[in-house]
Amino acid sequence: MAPKQIRTIGQVSQYVCLLSKPVSPVSGQVRQFTSPVDASIPASKQKFVPSSGTYPKGFKVSGSHAGVKASNTSAPDLALVWSEEPCSAAAVFTTNKFQAAPVQVSSELIRKRNGNGIRGVIVNAGCANAVTGKKGLQDARSMSKKADECNGLKEEDSSTLVMSTGVIGQLLPIERILNKVPEAQSNLASTHAAWLRTARAICTTDTFPKLTSRSFSLPSSPDRTYSIAGMTKGAGMIHPNMATLLGIICTDAPIEAPVLQSLLSHSISRSFNSISVDGDTSTNDTVAILANGAAGGTPISSTGSKDYTAMQSILTQFTQSLAQLVVRDGEGATKFVTVRVKNSPSYTDAKCIASTIARSPLVKTALYGKDANWGRILCAVGYTPDLTPGTVVPERTSVSFKPADGSAELKLLVNGEPESVDEGRASSILQHEDLEIVVDLGGGASGEAGRGGEDAIYWFCDFSHEYVTINGDYRT
């Protein structure tokens, strides 16, 4: 059975915050359920928090303190992202059957508006507003309406998407939140400081705010500069279909709603649907992108245009960087692992195998222990369910470690035959934070290795003692 994909609804905006540089996780970093402030960001990660940015025209943001979680007495936990003009929007949502109230409300809003006329996103951290019944739905709608009202909108249908993250099964302190929305609106700004504070406001067990931005051009307007910015949160309960992961992406490029949804869906399948921290899929996952066209130019209206092809590459790279950043901040993580499955008869089967390896507790714990136990990797390949017959042929399968320093691969298994492994070199490779595992299927039964075989990439982290500590103490 192929890995499930994040469900796409209508035309929704995607918002995602990422860092442009890799982040080094710190073992033993104690995580508190609150938005990180400067003093709590691990020293090794502070340098990856951007000191400046290039932000899209027409967007303003704010991060305010509402005290959603009683223990949070000062950190921002209410975020507002707002466009001065109506946006095309696209979004993807969790496929968990117990979809949180904000997921239901936002997906409904996008369907009603066909991805048009969206103005912003309001987010609270500290309470997921999931499995909260009719009251939870009412509260999510109230947040959307309040954001509209504070920005002078009085339409019957709301135009603000809603996101929440935190503990499941608890009602929002809704009056506390609603009373702070006017402050969030008055604090809206387009400065780097405002974007950074907003990225902090959506964090929970994250150890640092994840924010990035970049400029780009399109073939139809090579002299025109566009910008894209994103923020995200996520460190645990991470596995497609997305998993306590919220992402907000904003761009000033002109993109029509149906095309925007196509762009987002393509990028998600190769980014957020290709990561895993712990194999759990959250009730609240949402990634949205908003495009307000404020930078001008010819709107992207066709999937067959050169602008569409260029934008597809830009957005996919952007979301991949963000997705990788989430893995790098995985709860208790000490390793950032890329698993590449090569020469498969199909992309779907290759991705399914990569996902199975990434979710294996035995593989993850071996990597944490710096144990080159490649048998666990091979075992995961062998028990991957519902593959197309002939995908995995033992005598054609090879496994190797690819070091982060660019040196030669360490071959562990070649065409089904074990290699004489240099344990010293294997141990040296596993001392590094970054590692790539390469599984070559040799074309499966077809034997088409190197001649058009399909490849898939997945990113994951290891399991450490700290992961258990963090999640054992999550509600305390």
From Swiss-Prot:
Its EC number is 2.3.1.35, 2.3.1.1. Coiled coil: none annotated. Pfam families: ArgJ. Keywords: Acyltransferase, Amino-acid biosynthesis, Arginine biosynthesis, Autocatalytic cleavage, Mitochondrion, Multifunctional enzyme, Transferase. It catalyses: N(2)-acetyl-L-ornithine + L-glutamate = N-acetyl-L-glutamate + L-ornithine; L-glutamate + acetyl-CoA = N-acetyl-L-glutamate + CoA + H(+). GO terms for molecular function: glutamate N-acetyltransferase activity; L-glutamate N-acetyltransferase activity. InterPro entries: Arg_biosynth_ArgJ, ArgJ-like_dom_sf, ArgJ_beta_C. Substrate binds at T204, K233, T244, E331, N471, T476. One of its GO terms (cellular component) is mitochondrial matrix. Heterodimer of an alpha and a beta chain. This is Arginine biosynthesis bifunctional protein ArgJ, mitochondrial. It comes from Arthroderma otae (strain ATCC MYA-4605 / CBS 113480).
